[in-house]
Structure formats: C-alpha cells, structure tokens
C-alpha cells in the first residue's frame, strides 16, 4: 500500500538536505509531474528517482538507529509492512542494512502474502490474516467466518510456493471469542498452516 508516497515526505529541512546530497534544487514540478503527481503507474523522472534514493538512504539510516536501540535492550525489532512505509521497502537496496529481525504484514491475498514471505535479510516473516477483529465485520449482517475462509483460501496457495514463518490475527479478541463458530474456524486455519509449515521446511516448491 502506498497511500501518499514520497511526495508527502517533503519538508524545508528535507529539501535542504537533498540539495546538498544531489547538487541541485528540488523543484515543485518534480512532485506535480504534469498533474499526475507521481502515481505508481507513472514512469518517474530522473529527479524524482534521485529523491526516492535520497529518502531511502535517510530513512534506512534512521531506522537502523531505532533497531540498534531495540537490540541494546535485548529485544527483537519487527517492522509492520503496510500503510505508509516509504524508505524501508524490503526490496530496496538499503533495507538489509537496517538490521531488522522480522517483518509482519497484512495478508489480503496471495500477492500480499508473497510480498511478505519473499523478503530476504530477516530471520522470519509473519502474516496478519483477515478479518481483523473489528466491529465492522463482527456485527449483525457481517460474515467473519466466511471472510476468514476466503482469506485463507487466497493465502494458502501462495503459502505453498513461499511459506511464511508465522501467522496471526489482530483486533479485539472479545469480538472473536463471542462469535459462534469463529474460534473453531481459526483452529482449522492454524492446523492447516502448521501442516504446510512442517512439510515445506527446506523443500523447494518446484
């Protein structure tokens, strides 16, 4: 997900630092982009690519400082991959230098599962399966069991190609525990995941 993108990371301080790094001023047109505002479906300009690289260098350096603090307390550092994570893209060339122990992300489909499970340079990956335990699903007219089954079917096939190390759910546990049959459904999901995980260890999918 990229709700705002690099265009939302501009500030007077950043522009000053970019000019020192790149050797030229960052112009408004590099963001306006002829009115397209650097949509993900646009080929970025050379100047915008420079800005992306600059931000990746800066953000990864800052992220490493935070990870080092976490490690100094003997804890693992895990990043949630989602919403707005510019600069720390796991497939970027500076990601490995952050030193994260793990990455967790929301699994909406087989595509997003692979985006998480294929990440290199971390000790393990985790998928947050759907639905979230929120009132918009666990309500009159909602179908959390159906959503859980549908999400698992989409994720399961991708899991066979590139397994996650862990799965989980998020939200208000009381909503899940009070919904008839939901915990039983999740138990089935967890059992299947464990079987796949055990059978896939060290075994190529093709």
Over which residues does each language-model region extend?
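Polysaccharide-binding and catalytic clefts of secreted carbohydrate-active enzymes
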Residues: 1-100, 106-109, 115
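General secondary-structure edge motif
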Residues: 50, 138-139
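Carbohydrate-binding surfaces of carbohydrate-active enzymes
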Residues: 71-73, 109-122, 126-133, 139-206
């Amino acid at each position: 997900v990229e709700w705002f993108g690099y265009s939302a990371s501009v500030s007077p301080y950043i522009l000053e630092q970019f000019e020192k790094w790149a050797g030229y001023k960052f112009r408004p047109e590099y963001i306006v982009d002829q009115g397209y505002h650097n949509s993900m479906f646009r080929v970025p300009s050379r100047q915008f690519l420079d800005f992306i690289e600059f931000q990746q260098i800066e953000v990864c350096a800052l992220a490493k400082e935070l990870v080092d603090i976490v490690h100094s307390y003997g804890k693992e550092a895990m990043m949630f991959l989602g919403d707005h994570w510019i600069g720390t893209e796991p497939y970027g060339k500076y990601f490995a230098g952050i030193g994260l122990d793990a990455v967790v992300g929301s699994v909406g489909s087989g595509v997003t599962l692979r985006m998480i499970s294929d990440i290199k340079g971390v000790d393990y990956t985790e998928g947050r399966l759907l639905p979230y335990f929120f009132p918009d699903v666990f309500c009159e007219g909602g179908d959390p069991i159906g959503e859980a089954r549908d999400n698992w079917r989409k994720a399961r096939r991708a899991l066979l190609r590139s397994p996650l190390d862990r799965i989980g759910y998020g939200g208000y546990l009381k909503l899940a525990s009070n919904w008839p049959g939901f915990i039983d459904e999740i138990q089935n999901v967890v059992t299947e995941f464990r079987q796949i995980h055990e059978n896939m260890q060290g075994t190529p999918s093709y």
